[in-house]
Amino acid sequence: NAIDNVAFLNADIFNNEVEDNFFDFVWCSGVLHHTKDSKKGFEIISRWVKEDGLIIIGVYNKIGRLRTNFRQAIYKLLRKSVFAMKLISMLDPHLRKNLSHEKKLAWFRDQYDHPVERKHSIDEVMNWFEENNISYLGSIPNSSFEFKTVSQMSGYKGTYLARVFAQILMLFSNLGGEGGLCIIVGKKNNAFK
């Protein structure tokens, strides 16, 4: 049963194989922070979104990723040995779950063996949004400290201090324990406003 109004794309963002204003909705999670230039990657994919379309990105958070960064340092300090893999498997909350060997290996490679990794703050991504004609709708975590679905997000930014505190709280939640991924949601503005 094919869906004729959905397009999935697996390509190099920097080849920019998509025409501008093509998608109503762009979801790019777990990608930009593994590219040669996260901001440039965002600039490219933001052009793909139609006016009034939504864009959701998931990037590693500078603060929320600190626990993972600590485990990464241990893994590298122990020279990525078999012992290091076993130790990290005990320390990483996601790897302690009852997962298949394949899923554990995929998680391990993504979290500990990826050659390129960048981390970004919510404010940094909010600046990307502003520079690319995208209105900030919300994020997970957010400065109101309440979970909101995309349809409930109102663009409330809160204060800088509240945004920083929300990111610090990632260290004490499942968000920080499982990789420190931060979700940021925006809406493409009308070019003539």
Model-derived segments and spans:
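Short "lid" loop at the C-terminus of a central beta-strand within the Rossmann-like core
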Residues: 32, 60-65, 141-142
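Conserved SAM-binding strand-loop segment of SAM-dependent methyltransferases
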Residues: 2-15
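A short glycine-rich, Lys/Arg-flanked "PGG" loop and its adjoining helix->strand segment in the class I
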Residues: 39-51
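A short acidic, Gly/Pro-enriched loop at the edge of an enzyme's catalytic core
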Residues: 14-26
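A short SAM/SAH-binding and catalytic strip from SAM-dependent methyltransferases
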Residues: 24-38, 61
